[in-house]
């Protein structure tokens, strides 16, 4: 395919020795959102031909693993796996390379084979990025980060909501290196949530103590939950989770069992 002479990133990639113009997208994403740091362990899903692997290695200098159904031409200092990211066998191989502690960052610039039918291509993109998200959740360490390319469309909001459920910080970002006519956008998720709960979950708890700011405190599987409503120590309540942070959550009270018990006793 003939290249537009105005495609400066294509020619820049050739001049600077990168395998694809996509390299500059990752540079720009990282400059804006500071996802990759020095010595990070990084896994690139759908990594062929390897443009993002080269950038990840340059920024991090740490352990870099590329995964793709196709063979990835060797890159110095980068390990590769030929496999399907939805396969348990591939997940096992990734964990063997990055260690049980998990990866610091998972990146994915993969795109589905395009048919020319936009609705079909968008659906395929969402399916692929959902697989990437599920894989990332299995191989990231707690508070790890995620970058993935998504095609915009009517299912994009639903996908963003899925990412929000799993990460403390989420943003959608379009780097300058993306072509103006492209519908691609990059979703960034920072600080993987490893809490035993999520927004809208409901629990029956006992208020164990009152914090310094007057917040009632309860625990769900040893995870701290702060009440946003007035409660008393020892009170039994039903709560609904309204916000989740890496190390604690906030909840509102939706039922007070002690009050119900008192009402029954009065009857």
Curated annotation (Swiss-Prot):
It is an enzyme of class 2 (transferase). It catalyses: uridine(2552) in 23S rRNA + S-adenosyl-L-methionine = 2'-O-methyluridine(2552) in 23S rRNA + S-adenosyl-L-homocysteine + H(+). S-adenosyl-L-methionine binds at residues 50, 52, 68, 84, 109. One of its GO terms (cellular component) is cytoplasm. Residues 196-255 form the TRAM domain. InterPro entries: NA-bd_OB-fold, RNA_methyltr_RlmE, RNA_MeTrfase_FtsJ_dom, rRNA-MeTfrase_E, SAM-dependent_MTases_sf, TRAM_dom. It holds the Pfam family TRAM. It is found in: Cytoplasm. Gene3D superfamilies: Nucleic acid-binding proteins, Vaccinia Virus protein VP39. Belongs to the class I-like SAM-binding methyltransferase superfamily. RNA methyltransferase RlmE family. Specifically methylates the uridine in position 2552 of 23S rRNA at the 2'-O position of the ribose in the fully assembled 50S ribosomal subunit. This is Ribosomal RNA large subunit methyltransferase E.
């Amino acid at each position: 395919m003939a290249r537009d002479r105005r495609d400066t990133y294509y020619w820049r990639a050739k001049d600077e020795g990168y395998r694809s113009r996509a390299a500059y997208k990752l540079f720009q994403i990282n400059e804006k959102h500071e996802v990759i740091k020095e010595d990070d362990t990084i896994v690139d899903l759908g990594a062929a031909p390897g443009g993002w692997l080269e950038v990840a290695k340059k920024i991090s200098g740490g352990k870099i693993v590329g995964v793709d159904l196709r063979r990835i031409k060797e890159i110095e200092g980068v390990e590769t796996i030929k496999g399907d990211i939805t396969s348990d066998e591939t997940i096992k191989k990734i964990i063997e390379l990055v260690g049980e502690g998990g990866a610091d960052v998972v990146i994915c610039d993969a795109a589905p084979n395009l048919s020319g039918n936009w609705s079909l291509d968008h659906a395929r993109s969402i399916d692929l990025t959902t697989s990437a998200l599920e894989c990332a959740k299995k191989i990231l360490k707690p508070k790890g980060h995620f970058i993935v390319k998504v095609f915009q469309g009517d299912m994009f909001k639903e996908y963003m909501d899925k990412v929000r459920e799993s990460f403390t910080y989420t943003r959608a970002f379009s780097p300058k290196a993306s072509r103006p006519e492209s519908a691609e956008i990059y979703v960034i998720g920072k600080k993987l949530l490893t809490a035993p709960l999520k927004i809208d979950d409901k629990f029956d708890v006992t208020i164990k103590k009152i914090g310094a700011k007057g917040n009632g405190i309860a625990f769900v599987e040893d995870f701290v939950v702060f009440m946003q409503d007035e409660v008393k120590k020892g009170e039994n309540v039903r709560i609904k989770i309204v916000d989740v942070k890496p190390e604690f959550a906030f909840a509102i009270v939706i039922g007070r069992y002690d009050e119900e018990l008192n009402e029954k006793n009065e009857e």
